[in-house]
Amino acid sequence: MSEYRSPKYGKGRKRKRKQSSSSPIVIGLVLVMAVLVLFSLGLRLLLNSGGSAPAVEMETPETAAAAETAPAETVKEKGPSLWQRLFGSKETEPPEMPEPEHVVSTASIAVTGDVLMHMPVINTGLRSDGSYNFDSIFQYLNTYASAADLAVANLETTLAGSDKGYKYSGHPAFNCPDEIVDALKNAGFDLLLTANNHCYDTSEYGFLRTVTTVRSKGLQVLGTRAEVSEPKYAVQEVNGIKIGMVNYTYQGLPENPTAGKVYMNRNTLSDTCALLVNSFVPGQLDSFYQEVNQCLTEMKANGAEATVMFIHWGNEYQTTPSTEQQQIAQQLCDMGFDVIVGGHPHVIQSAALLTSRVDPDRKTVCLYSTGNAVSNQRIAEMDLKTGHTEDGLLFSMTFSKYSDGTVYLEEVDLLPCWVDLRTEPQTQYPIIPLDDSIRDQWQSLFGLTDEALEGAQKSYDRTLELTGSGIRQAREYLAQQKQQREADYLAAVTETQEAA
């Protein structure tokens, strides 16, 4: 509101106006003439536009009855006012303002650890007719895995079958019945990682059959492939967001470095399979970085809007990532990966928020190891008596696409899990999701004994001790970035409105 100001007058005395008795009469005549002119113009405009004044009609009983039974007239759109038709003025409509940028779609990915099928675990699936069913392993996890748009697990076994001279076996050469894939699919998993140190445990036959079997059951494979012509990576559209993913594993150190062979779990890969697995030699990383960078370039050329690296690395049973793991993670961050998810140590390792040395404004979330999803690595069976080999998790990441087309990593989260071992009424290895929001129901929902409940609680604490700080830092950073984006979008819209 403008400040009220009193009228200003010139200096000196006010000039006295000459009085005239005829002035009011003249002014009145002028006003009457102006009104008549305006009325005449308005009437002419109405007639020209087809309008006419309605005639006044006395209401009779007949006309009243007709009015009650007559159909209602369609209400016509209101035209311009008389003032607008007389003087041509238009009501100024506000300019159309752009909507603030907002999320138009999200894509969530959930990742669990090593599906490590030791023989005691395999035996729990055997049925009286000779078939296998492993659904009991995932009976409690399926609700959480199926809630993700894309669920991923590391298949740390081969699928060579039992009709070509191979027997089902656990450590050290894993070969599991095909039904493990059915169980994973039934639990909501969509993609299996197969680049790991056990992918050649049943030689070339088992290597290739694993790929074809997983695909034949409707799941995807990443890390190994059946043909050299297939890409080493995948670009998958999830809810309108294209996510580029790649899976690599470390190689065993060569017995003869000059032979040019690839080694996995003390096995020498055939020349064919050596070209069908994504792998790197620890300590010889330059060629690995070049290859990964090429994958990253191709993924983006194929439309990838977000990128994830799944990597099999590190030292078994070590809860702290090695120096080499950290060096590789930093290099992958510098390349531009959004998320890094590791496996192989069979224990959970820490999470970290990494800062790119190329672009300090760019961050990467890294979970160094997801631990075991399922295994028989019980405290009683292990030299490591801490219980960490019984611990697993479901790590989730959510990408969001905004209305301007940009995609961001919006959130990460972690669900601790624990593998229970039951012997009654039959032996089972169910994965227990340790959802803190229902902690008071763990025992009743999952059928835990008092001893098992204590084991679950200890597992939860171990996992949070290892990952809590890094996950919390990542979550806080991502939340701040989202808040800043929303503030920037709002400021841009406000500026546009003010300019208009």
Positions of PLM-derived features:
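Acidic, metal/ion-coordinating pockets
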Residues: S2-K11, S23-A64, E68-A500
